[in-house]
Regions:
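N-terminal subdomain of nucleotide-sugar transferases
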Residues: 1-63
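A conserved catalytic-core segment of Leloir-type glycosyltransferases
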Residues: 41-93
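Helix-loop-beta element that forms the nucleotide-linked donor phosphate-binding surface
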Residues: 116-120, 162-202
Length: 209
C-alpha cells in the first residue's frame, strides 16, 4: 500500500534485535517499510538500550519516551508494564493525525480505550498471554515481595486484557495456541463488535505472517 502511514508503538527500542520480542518488532518494521508503508515509530527507552539511528532508515518518524518507573505506576489499577508507558507525549503524537495504530503487546496499550482514539483502526500484536506469563513468574519466584508483585501484575493484566480485546479492531496472535485462547475469550465476552483475530507468526530475518 504505497503512501500509507501507520503508528507503531513498541514496548522497547527494537534495536539491537537481540531478543524475541524486539526481533519481531524490528523485522516487522523492515517488512512494512519494504511494502511502502511509512511507519511512525514510538518506543520506550529504559535500561541500557539507547536511541538507534538505523531505525530512521525504515521509519518516517522515530519518537522515544521514558518509562515512569515510580511508585505510582506500581500502585496504579493498570498493570505496571502498561502504566509505566502511559506517556502524555505519546498520546499527543497519536492525536496529530487519524492513521491506524499498531500496539505491540499489552505493554503499549495504555491509551487503547481513550475516547479520542475511538474512531481509529487499532491493531494489537499479542506477543503471548501476558497474565499467564506473570502467573508462571510468580510460581518460580521465591522472594516474598517479588511474588506479591508478580501475583498482582498477573491479576491486573487479566482484567486489562478484557479492556484491550473490547477496544481492538484486529488482534494479531503469534501461535495457534494463542489464537485458540483469544477466540475462546471472545466467545465468553460476546462483544457487539468483536475484533478479528489473525494468526501472524513471529517476524524474523525471513519475515513472518
Amino acid at each position: 500500500m504505497p503512501n500509507s502511514r501507520l503508528h507503531l508503538i513498541s514496548f522497547d527500542i527494537p534495536l539491537p534485535a537481540d531478543y524475541g520480542g524486539v526481533m519481531d518488532v524490528f523485522y516487522k518494521i523492515k517488512a512494512l517499510h519494504e511494502a511502502g508503508i511509512a511507519v511512525i515509530l514510538h518506543c520506550f527507552q529504559y535500561r541500557e538500550r539507547k536511541p538507534q539511528a538505523e531505525l530512521e532508515k525504515y521509519c518516517a518518524e522515530v519518537h522515544y519516551y521514558p518509562r515512569d518507573l515510580g511508585p505510582l505506576s506500581i500502585l496504579s489499577s493498570q498493570p505496571f508494564i502498561v502504566r509505566s508507558r502511559a506517556s502524555k507525549a505519546l498520546l499527543k503524537n497519536l492525536l496529530k493525525d487519524n492513521v491506524p495504530i499498531l500496539f505491540e503487546g499489552l505493554h503499549s496499550c495504555a491509551f487503547i480505550a481513550d475516547k479520542r482514539l475511538e474512531d481509529r483502526l487499532k491493531i494489537v500484536r499479542m506477543h503471548n498471554v501476558e497474565w499467564e506469563y506473570y502467573r508462571n513468574l510468580n510460581a518460580l519466584e521465591s522472594r516474598f515481595w517479588k511474588k506479591i508483585y508478580f501475583a498482582m501484575e498477573s491479576k491486573k493484566l487479566q482484567l486489562f486484557e478484557n479492556q484491550v480485546i473490547s477496544h481492538a479492531n484486529i488482534i494479531l496472535t503469534i501461535s495457534p495456541d494463542d489464537t485458540a485462547y483469544f477466540e475462546e475469550r471472545l466467545e465468553k465476552q460476546a462483544l457487539a463488535k468483536p475484533p478479528r483475530i489473525v494468526l501472524c507468526a513471529a517476524f524474523s530475518s525471513q519475515y513472518g505472517c
